[in-house]
């Protein structure tokens, strides 16, 4: 898919940060986790569009402009909302569970990023772990 210049630099920044974190770490000691947010929403996976998904603020003002149509689940509380797209709501639920796991356990519940596997979590219609999802940025910028 075609990427805008901002997306190219964002990917390069993430790849650089991840590579620098694991540079001198044995793979089994890695405490680095990387994700790639690809939920299409209304405007694609724009910068910060993942925040309502991570924090469950789907009913917040303007959140639906990023993540897609939402339905209020409690008329007394317009911020209580779920995505109308079932796959999107499942993705949001899984993202919130990963964040909670990270806070409680010190890891998000998916394999850590290391210089051997470079695993990252892909948040899209079918969330999954993927090997080296930032390979394009890593190799383009000569990171390894």
Locations of the language-model features?
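Mobile gating loops/cap/lid regions near enzyme active sites that modulate substrate access
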Residues: 14, 18-144
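Single conserved hydrophobic/aromatic residue that forms the stacking wall/gate
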Residues: 1-9
């Amino acid at each position: 898919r075609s990427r805008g210049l901002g997306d190219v630099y964002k990917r390069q920044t993430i790849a650089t940060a991840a590579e620098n974190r694991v540079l001198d770490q044995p793979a089994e000691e890695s405490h680095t986790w990387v994700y790639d947010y690809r939920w299409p929403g209304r405007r694609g996976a724009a910068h910060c569009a993942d925040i309502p998904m991570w924090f469950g603020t789907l009913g917040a003002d303007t959140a639906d402009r990023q993540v897609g149509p939402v339905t209020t689940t409690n008329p007394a509380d317009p911020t209580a909302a779920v995505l109308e797209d079932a796959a999107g709501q499942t993705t949001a639920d899984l993202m919130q569970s990963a964040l909670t796991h990270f806070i409680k356990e010190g890891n998000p519940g998916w394999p850590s990023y290391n210089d051997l596997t470079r695993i990252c979590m892909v948040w899209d219609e079918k969330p999954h772990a993927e090997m080296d999802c930032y390979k394009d940025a890593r190799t383009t910028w000569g990171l390894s």
